[in-house]
UniProtKB/Swiss-Prot annotation:
The gene is holA. This is DNA polymerase III subunit delta. It catalyses: DNA(n) + a 2'-deoxyribonucleoside 5'-triphosphate = DNA(n+1) + diphosphate. Belongs to the DNA polymerase HolA subunit family. Its EC number is 2.7.7.7.
Length: 332
């Protein structure tokens, strides 16, 4: 069984159609991209009709088996798409595949979706029980290195002419948000079709289109990107953005970082999980906690508390100046 990781989706050569595909993960746009690639390849191989089945009860497996039995070389080619419910175990999925595998043939294509938020899902799947003529595609969150790989092949796939510095600027700006990065690349390929895209093009595009969110400001701070964090603060100030929202977001991350620094067992991921921190921000927060001294974090929390006290006293005229000071403290 072939395994394709989502960051290599665009680099993989989908020339031969597999008998079945297993798409594992929870990142919707990656799942959709994988599905589109499979369906386009299936169409070239004479498949057109697709039946969608969402498993609610094991009894549905019998309906699929009956459908599979009815497909032979004299019937039209058919695609069966099976989406397993979120609560189903990997073991149950594998049992269903075992029942279905003897009915796989050239007129039947299976696309199986397994929803999972576990980035180590492959460790729980025994790929040996699957028939060898299938392909598994993982659609889970990327780390920073995987984002660079995915971006490189995405750019190649859409035939975009872009400098390396401009590519790095895009990755840095999107702060790990692959969905927004994907949308931006698609737009850029249309706006600057057949033209070289440089850092100036990207900077102008970002300035024209940007509507920043609190997490983008915090991610810029934790990446020590002072210039970008100041730019975001400028926009928030001009928009009269509610500063309490910024305080709450930053308080959460600073307290999480403090807990990580205090943890003697180095069980960082349990702390992040208990603090409901998004998985694609784990490495960012851990790396910042490792780099920075206690004094920087305590000083930042103290200043953040003073800013909140000023807001509660309705002294909002000079509120934004301490935010700029806070940005400098956190970044330096």
């Amino acid at each position: 069984m072939k395994i394709i990781h989502s960051e290599n989706l665009f680099s993989y050569s989908f020339k031969t159609l597999s008998s079945y595909y297993v798409i594992v993960g929870n990142v919707k746009h990656l799942i959709q991209q994988s599905t589109n690639i499979i369906l386009n390849l299936a169409k070239k191989n004479g498949f057109s009709k697709m039946s969608k089945i969402i498993f609610c009860d094991p009894i549905y497996i019998n309906n699929i088996i009956l459908s599979a039995k009815s497909q032979n070389l004299f019937f039209k080619k058919k695609i069966i798409s099976i989406s397993f419910k979120k609560y189903i175990s990997i073991k149950e999925v594998q049992n269903y595949i075992l029942k279905l595998k003897k009915y796989l043939h050239t007129n039947l294509l299976l696309i199986i979706y397994i929803y999972s938020t576990n980035t180590n899902i492959l460790n729980k799947i025994n790929t040996k029980i699957f028939p060898p003529n299938g392909t598994m595609i993982t659609c889970t969150f990327f780390n920073q290195n995987n984002i660079s790989i995915w971006t490189k092949y995405k750019i190649k796939n859409i035939k975009m002419n872009i400098t390396k510095n401009a590519e790095n600027l895009l990755i840095q700006y999107h702060q790990g948000n692959v969905l927004h990065l994907n949308n931006t690349l698609n737009i850029l390929s249309l706006v600057w079709k057949n033209k070289l895209i440089n850092t100036l093009s990207i900077t102008n595009f970002i300035e024209d289109c940007s509507i920043f969110k609190p997490l983008q400001w915090i991610n810029a701070l934790l990446n020590n990107n002072l210039q970008f964090s100041i730019k975001i603060l400028n926009q928030f100030e001009n928009q009269n953005f509610n500063p309490i929202i910024l305080i709450r977001y930053l308080q959460h991350d600073l307290l999480t970082i403090l807990l990580i620094k205090r943890d003697d067992v180095k069980n960082y991921y349990n702390i992040l999980k208990n603090r409901n921190t998004n998985k694609n921000r784990h490495s960012l927060i851990i790396n910042y906690a490792r780099r920075k001294h206690y004094k920087t974090i305590y000083k930042s929390i103290k200043l953040l508390t003073l800013i909140e006290l000023q807001i509660k006293k309705n002294n909002t005229k000079l509120i934004w100046l301490p935010f700029y000071t806070l940005s400098i403290i956190i970044c330096l």
